[in-house]
Amino acid sequence: MTSFFLIFFGLIIYKSAFYDLPGISKKITLTAFGLKVIFSFLIWAIYTFYYTDRLTSDIFKYFDDAKILHGLVLESPLNFFKVVFALDTSSPEIKSHLEKLNFWYKTHDYGIFNDNRTIIRFNALVYLFSLGYYHIHAITMCFLSFTGLVAIYKVFIPHVKDKSKELFFAVFLLPSVLFWGSGILKEGLLIFSLGCLIYQFMKITNNQFQVARLFWIFILLGLLFITKVYLLLMIMPGLISLLVIKYSGTKKIALKFILVHVLLIIMALNWKVILRLPGGELTGTEVVTGKSLDLLNMLKYKQKDFVHEAKIEKAGSYIELGELDNTLYSFLKNSPKGIINVLFRPHLLDSRSPIVLLAALENLIFILLIFLAVFFFKKPHDEQKPILYFSISFVLLLALLIGLVVPVLGAIVRYKVPMLPFYAIIFLILIDKEKLIKKLPFLKILI
């Protein structure tokens, strides 16, 4: 049965024009999908034979909860679909069934959508045709995340037409993206929704408007919201900046990006205060500084919860963070260290497990790319600048958020997976390929 679904998704990739990648043969494209499937078996093996506790393993704990939720189909198919599509989760009959699940409810509640339920619902839906075979769930997730990666490739290839091989590597073959994007994890849904959202958005901004595209944008925004709302928030400044440039022209692109981001950050830090503006309860100082702000408070307590859980579980890759309070000063003071931790750690000295070692070696690749971008710098042309600045915005904002609140390198490795293709593409745009090959001719064989 697993083979049937593998062939089914393979045929979709082979036959559908959407999966035609400029500069890349269909055979290579199918091989990349096959590689994801191999990695899905690898992650299954690691969490089956090495990390054996299913209650602490993300690839199993939501899968096992979905099995319990799927049991509701036998009792009441109507109630099952009410839960899966979030139409009703509070009636006594449904609630008594949901209380059997281990991870439907979170220990810490910040008034934000509980994203555990999204991956449980996904697995419950797949259960309808998987008959409980884990690998069918994994292959389905591989197909979705692969679709998101295809969308990312198609967004960027017009801007790096002479670097199709390098772009293919940056999007599809980064170790962390291959590994974490191929299990039954939220990362797969994030890559799918993120990639497809940017793809549809760019089509509209490039004067290819269709009502269907707008429909898909709303669906994908919703999926991002219920999977990881913070990822949606981190990508919005870049998308809004692209819209501003679309309707204001391509002059002073960097300045427009900066102004949009500054304005949105001030609004985000003062969202609760701004809501009180009509009542006249504010001072100008409050609007600028965000005094007594819930967002900073939320970050403070989110950090405390991460630190508390890491210490209880005795996380092997624990690192010290600068402590946050609910002031803008502590946020700014700890931001540089947070960004550096995400972009450059784990390093080789941090490597106490094979998974962290893999990420450390991957970070060496990024350090090499930084040096290449410095010594073989190529000024981006005007058509590249909007998508380049968008990528920089997304990478830095997500790195900032993760770096401020996550004190475990193993968790950092996972949380930054959605930004890694964009991180690599930044250097792809900035490196002069001709200068590099001229200086190092042997690279011509590879690129």
Predicted feature descriptions by range:
Residues F18-Y19, P158, N207-A212, L372-S393:
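Membrane-interface helix-loop-helix junctions at transmembrane boundaries of multi-pass membrane enzymes
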Residues L178-F179, R213-I235:
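Membrane-interface alpha helices of multi-pass inner-membrane proteins
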Residues I24-K27, F209-W216, Y247-L263:
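Membrane-interfacial entry segments at the cytosolic side of transmembrane helices
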Residues G183-K186:
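Short acidic/glycine- and proline-prone juxtamembrane loop motifs at membrane-interface regions
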Residues L131, H135, I152-L173:
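Transmembrane-helix signature of polytopic, membrane-embedded enzymes
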Residues I7-I12, G338, V342-H347, A359-D382:
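Hydrophobic, aromatic-rich transmembrane alpha-helices
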Residues Y51-D64, L74-K100, Y110-F122, S335, ...:
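Extracytoplasmic catalytic/substrate-binding loops of multi-pass membrane glycan-assembly enzymes
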Residues I12-S16, L125, H137-H159, L368-L372:
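Transmembrane-helix motifs of polytopic, lipid-linked glycan transferases
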